[in-house]
């Protein structure tokens, strides 16, 4: 009898977890997603408001990132783990106590690891839900792009640089600081993978705007002139709500014939694939720069036949990068040897 009750309870639990008719699909991955993301969110908000200063450079000069220490929404951040910790896994039980753990930036690892595992679980949940509904798996494939970007910035880059102190701070100003320092140290703007990523993101935005405007401009009129065109659409209707042939004809004549799609499926696959592939490539670029396979640099000035310098924008960019690098961790640098 007891085993029967347990069997029924387990069956009811499985039915609740895997049912695709729930208002919010949970799924087996959801059992990981919701606790992990909840812990990451609570820890992040708490640290953003209340965390003490962190010895990010490992030189006993802690940096404060919380609001209680005078920061605002722009300058506030969860400061990365101390350089003294390096790439060691640093849970609370590896420290002598909570004060030491906070001083060495253990909160950063806590938030990053829980967040990253949570969003990976979210990707798995997307696949699981698609599988339950008999859908194709492209939603979870598309979501792998931001997952790859998060892995590159929060996991691979700190490991490649030898310390989680090189990870991106979890704040607005910290993000921009990370971007500037990344350019100074790795010349990311001159890396071909970053260039392809920019083409992917901005190209995806352009294509999305073009597609949306074309569809909105070629809606099939199902209503009277005094009514909104939106009232002519019924959710779940079998008929198309716009004329793809009209949109194709317009765009083909606006630019040239083969710049336009005449197949709705290939069009939407292209709209999904272009930015996803671009972000994949950028993530790969950040992962390679993590191990100092950098973009093109201008460390050598241009010389004429007599050996005199020829001033160029390359020198300006190089000096700007050096200046940014000096300002970054200014007390940890040994000027000018660090610029060699």
UniProtKB/Swiss-Prot annotation:
Membrane topology reported for the UniProt record: Multi-pass membrane protein
Quaternary data: PSII is composed of 1 copy each of membrane proteins PsbA, PsbB, PsbC, PsbD, PsbE, PsbF, PsbH, PsbI, PsbJ, PsbK, PsbL, PsbM, PsbT, PsbX, PsbY, PsbZ, Psb30/Ycf12, at least 3 peripheral proteins of the oxygen-evolving complex and a large number of cofactors. It forms dimeric complexes.
Binding-site residues, chlorophyll a ChlzD1: 114
Binding site for chlorophyll a PD1: 194
Keyword annotations from UniProtKB, A to Z: Calcium, Chlorophyll, Chloroplast, Chromophore, Electron transport, Herbicide resistance, Iron, Magnesium, Manganese, Membrane, Metal-binding, Oxidoreductase, Photosynthesis, Photosystem II, Plastid, Thylakoid, Transmembrane, Transmembrane helix, Transport
InterPro entries: D1/D2, Photo_II_D1/D2_sf, Photo_RC_L/M, PSII_D1
Record bears the keyword Transmembrane helix: yes
Annotated site location: Tyrosine radical intermediate: 157
One cellular component (GO) term of this entry: chloroplast thylakoid membrane
Disulfide bonds: none
Protein name: Photosystem II protein D1
Described function: Photosystem II (PSII) is a light-driven water:plastoquinone oxidoreductase that uses light energy to abstract electrons from H(2)O, generating O(2) and a proton gradient subsequently used for ATP formation. It consists of a core antenna complex that captures photons, and an electron transfer chain that converts photonic excitation into a charge separation. The D1/D2 (PsbA/PsbD) reaction center heterodimer binds P680, the primary electron donor of PSII as well as several subsequent electron acceptors.
Binding site for pheophytin a: 122
EC number: 1.10.3.9
Residues that span the membrane, as ranges: 25-42, 114-129, 138-152, 193-214, 270-284
Species assigned in the record: Amphidinium carterae
Record has Electron transport as a keyword: yes
One Pfam family from the record: Photo_RC
Description of post-translational modifications: Tyr-157 forms a radical intermediate that is referred to as redox-active TyrZ, YZ or Y-Z.
Residues annotated for a quinone binding in this entry: 211, 260-261
Catalysed conversion reaction: 2 a plastoquinone + 4 hnu + 2 H2O = 2 a plastoquinol + O2
Annotated positions binding [CaMn4O5] cluster: 166, 185, 328-329, 338, 340
Cofactor binding notes: The D1/D2 heterodimer binds P680, chlorophylls that are the primary electron donor of PSII, and subsequent electron acceptors. It shares a non-heme iron and each subunit binds pheophytin, quinone, additional chlorophylls, carotenoids and lipids. D1 provides most of the ligands for the Mn4-Ca-O5 cluster of the oxygen-evolving complex (OEC). There is also a Cl(-1) ion associated with D1 and D2, which is required for oxygen evolution. The PSII complex binds additional chlorophylls, carotenoids and specific lipids.
Catalytic class of the enzyme: oxidoreductase
Residues that bind Fe cation: 211, 268
